[in-house]
Amino acid sequence: MKSFWSRIAIALLFITVTFSAKAEFGQWCVADSQIPDYVTQAALDWACQHGGADCSKIQPNQPCFLPNTLKDHASVVFNSYYQSYKHMGADCYFSSAAILTQRDPSHGSCHFEYIK
């Protein structure tokens, strides 16, 4: 009986350690689909022109050009800015045009960077 409980305790310890090791979640900054396009466009323009975001990935023939929608392009740019500057105090707000998600928005050849 003692051996049985020892095995159970070891199994539970193993499960706990395994799940806690995988419990680190990333955060990506993406466009909020509920926000009007004009707000999203203004935030995208600011991030590309003044914010220092990498907007090269959303250009034609680049990995994040497709799908060619405002929300998809804004998500790539907002995340670029957020990942680059979050350790310097940047947030994922963009005049309410963006939100944080713990779900990696990468798709196809378009990789959304995550910096710990």
Functional labels for PLM-detected ranges:
Residues 2-116:
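Folded extracytoplasmic luminal domains of secretory or organellar precursors
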